[in-house]
Amino acid sequence: MKVTVLDSIDAIERDEWDALVGTEYPFLRHAFLSLAENTGSVSPDAGWTPRHLVLRQDGRLRAALPLYEKNHSWGEFVFDWAWANAYNQAGFDYYPKLVSAVPFTPAPSARLLRARADDTDAAEILIAAATELAVDTDCSSLHVLFPDENDVPLLEDAGLILRKDCQFHWHNRGYETFDVFLATFTSAKRKKAKRDRRRVAENGISFRRVRGSDFDGDTWSMVYALIARTFMMRGSLPYFNQAFFEGLGRELPDNILAIIAEQDDQPIAAAVFFESDTALYGRYWGSDGHYDALHFETCYYQGIDYCIETGKQRFEPGTQGEHKVARGFVPATTWSAHWLAHPEFANAIERYLDEEGRHIDRYMDAVDAHTPYKAGEDET
């Protein structure tokens, strides 16, 4: 067996990589990672140096780990700025560090990619190789962000420190229509959701869906301009550039969906989603101004509508946002796993994460008490 470090995802054949990924997580596909690298959003100049690990046995690809060497903590959605500050104050370098993640994509998915799901030996070899690489390259630490529930116990068994967090997800309980879904709400919460949707309709706003295969350059230019405007209104630039978005339509046409809001036949807002056969993932949002309840409608209600129509089992709209709860999303635990070379810092962070995890548990319990569902209808 041999573990190799790749300095680009293009150093491995697309079909080989995708055979490990499967179809559930489109943003783990070779095309997504390749576009991110080749359009410049993920590159050494941007602080993301690819260090992907592949494990081969007799020439056959057995397992892989998406991995990057980073000199900052932007685009991760698992916040370790305080750790970096503590290192700096103690006279140590926190950067570079190794991060296993999908860049700018806070969606739980497999990290320890294996040809056979039960190949725990391969997972252990990858984890050991990643920590060894961290030592060999003078990285302070290894961070595995948003692993799925199958990876978490393997990472814990390998000695990584687990960190718990919370997102809000929607689950399809076999709803035939949106109204059937709303019927599971209490009366007051159902009225609020209907009022949200009514406000948008009363403003003369309509919606259309565009699949990746139907996008052209003009459509992507319009969607990207809306997304970029919203990012810049918040004082930042989009994580990905327009070339990346245009590439998605070409390379992943069956996995991309945009919902475009229009008023007087003019586009005023757009949300971009990824989809698999079973799930919808909300990723990017933009508008040309403020419209009452439009964000809720475009990013949440329209997505739920689409899931019900297509029979998707769950909808993950992105990070943070307690406002999602009133729209039918419920708390879901997410994880990250961390290895730090410095033993004293590792011990201190482990103690901190133990307390943080208890706080997250209390927070999720409190949120559970305020979901909009009737007694007996709650999704938790």
Description of each model-found segment:
Residues 1-380:
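N-acyltransferase acceptor-side catalytic subdomain
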